[in-house]
């Protein structure tokens, strides 16, 4: 039966094998090489398409599971998936405004960025998320704080019966300019969190 599945449904079979071994980076690396040998396309993690485990998308490519990224827990993945049902995330600001930030901590965000999980949203490259704009705080940390403040004000406006409606608008933060990482640096950081 296994040989039949591997021969007739190779992408689905390998997605299941990868999901079954996703807690062991060495095994994931081994099976990713097997996918490459079989000619299967494996796409990196993506907050707009990935699930907790490895899956096969409409183009018959295997999508890396966010649960296989080191430091990204099930709670973070579940809140990302739950809130993208409305529509895909369009920017880091859209993401931090919508998801439950109690479930997705700073480390989860950092590792998602390093793994390429936010590459599909907006025109922010990975180095920009870690840019410290002279104040010792990364742009990613500022974005998370922005989302927390936005949610806090939204919740307090909803729970206060006698308060006047807040017309407070939130301008997205300025995305810092900086050099992109070289491919070597980007791949090295990616390997730290996904094993390949």
Listing of model-derived features with the role each one plays in the protein:
Residues 1-196:
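Noncatalytic, beta-rich nucleic-acid-contacting surfaces in large DNA/RNA-processing enzymes
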């Amino acid at each position: 039966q296994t040989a039949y599945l591997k021969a007739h449904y190779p992408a689905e079979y390998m997605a299941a094998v990868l999901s079954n071994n996703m807690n062991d980076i060495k095994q994931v690396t081994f099976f990713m090489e097997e996918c490459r040998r079989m000619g299967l396309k494996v796409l990196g993690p993506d907050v707009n398409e990935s699930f907790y485990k490895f899956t096969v998308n409409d183009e018959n490519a295997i999508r890396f599971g966010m649960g296989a990224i080191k430091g990204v827990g099930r709670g973070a993945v579940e809140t990302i998936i739950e809130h993208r049902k409305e529509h895909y995330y369009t920017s880091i600001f859209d993401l931090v405004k919508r998801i439950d930030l109690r479930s997705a901590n700073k480390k989860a965000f950092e590792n998602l960025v390093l793994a390429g999980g936010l590459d599909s949203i907006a025109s922010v490259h990975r180095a920009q998320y870690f840019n410290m704009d002279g104040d010792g705080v990364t742009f990613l940390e500022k974005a998370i704080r922005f989302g927390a403040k936005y949610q806090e004000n939204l919740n307090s406006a909803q729970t206060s019966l006698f308060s006047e409606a807040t017309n407070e608008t939130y301008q997205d933060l300025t995305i810092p300019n900086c050099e992109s990482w070289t491919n070597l640096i980007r791949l090295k950081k990616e390997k730290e969190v996904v094993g390949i």
